């Protein structure tokens, strides 16, 4: 396993949500990215066995130079204008985005995945990677104004919205019972491989 490098990390974004909000992922084509969320059952140095969020056990082969990153809690007060963030959100009836979680990117990761796209955290969720242009009070918490190459968006962040950043980790985090998230590649034979694992650290679970 090579050492963690913030520059190398890419986020597919993103604490487990209530069971009612969980939906099975769409079948992935061979070599297509497959998001895996769950709890570690076993790690032997080369293979990770996970009880997935959807229920079935999943086995993930790890690349020889795989990396591990952890997450650390942050608060709304840690977000400032100019920060590059990822928000996973859903649209309210008024069309405004309501954040399910916010990730603060390290400066080295600015522009990672910039833009807005569908996400699979819950049905109809969106992921927006953008630069914070302003923060104002709102009836339901605070509103982040964010700007990306496609324009500007407003995201409501409630008082209970998980906010995290990424911190260095290593294989010692891959222990039974720890929560993980990864984006694995599905091979033609159905097996999964991954080069990066985001793992629970100091009790903070990946909110992806």
Residue ranges and their predicted role:
Residues 2-6, 17-208:
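Short, flexible, surface-exposed loop segments at domain boundaries
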Residues 11-12, 133:
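Repetitive helical segments and hydrophobic/amphipathic motifs
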């Amino acid at each position: 396993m090579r050492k963690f490098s913030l520059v190398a990390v890419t986020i597919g974004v993103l604490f487990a949500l209530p069971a009612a909000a969980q939906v099975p992922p769409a079948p992935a084509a061979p070599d297509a990215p497959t998001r895996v969320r769950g709890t570690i059952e076993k790690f032997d140095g080369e293979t990770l066995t996970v009880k997935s969020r959807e229920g079935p056990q999943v086995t993930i082969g790890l690349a020889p130079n795989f990396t591990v990153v952890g997450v650390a809690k942050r608060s709304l007060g840690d977000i400032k204008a100019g920060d590059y963030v990822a928000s996973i959100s859903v649209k309210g009836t008024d069309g405004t985005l309501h954040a399910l979680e916010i990730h603060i990117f390290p400066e080295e990761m600015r522009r990672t995945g910039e833009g807005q796209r569908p996400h699979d955290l819950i049905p109809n969720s969106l992921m927006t990677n953008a630069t914070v242009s302003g923060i104002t009070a709102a009836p339901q918490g605070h509103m982040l104004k964010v700007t990306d190459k496609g324009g500007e968006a407003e995201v409501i962040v409630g008082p209970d919205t998980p906010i995290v950043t990424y911190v260095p980790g290593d294989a010692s985090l891959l222990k039974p019972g720890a929560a993980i998230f990864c984006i694995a590649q599905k091979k033609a034979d159905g097996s999964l491989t991954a080069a990066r694992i985001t793992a629970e650290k100091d009790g903070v679970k990946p909110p992806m």
